[in-house]
């Protein structure tokens, strides 16, 4: 298998989920008491994508899945800090359940 035996380092993690936005909030949401109000557990409420875009226009043009992916990627890169590896050796893995 090509690449077998190579090491991988996970340096950042970004999460946008109904139980929390960001790594810490997500973890606390998983460990928390659950929903207090009757509602949809799969819904992200009070979402504001504007902090993740250069302009409000760009934020409006992006669909929800793109907004969440952008926010998660920015969080992961912030956690990773400065990466000294060659850019061609840096990668991102993105997963979604519905988007």
Residue ranges and their predicted role:
Residues 1-99:
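Conserved "HGTGT" condensation-loop signature of ketosynthase/thiolase-family condensing enzymes
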């Amino acid at each position: 298998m090509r690449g077998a035996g190579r090491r991988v380092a996970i340096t950042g993690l970004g999460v946008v989920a109904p139980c929390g936005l960001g790594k810490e909030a997500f973890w606390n949401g998983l460990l928390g008491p659950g929903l207090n109000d009757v509602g949809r557990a799969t819904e992200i409420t009070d979402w504001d994508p504007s902090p993740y875009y250069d302009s409000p226009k760009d934020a409006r043009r992006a669909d929800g899945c793109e907004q969440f992916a952008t926010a998660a990627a920015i969080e992961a890169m912030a956690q990773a800090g400065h990466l000294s590896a060659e850019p061609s050796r840096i990668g991102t893995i993105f997963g979604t359940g519905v988007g």
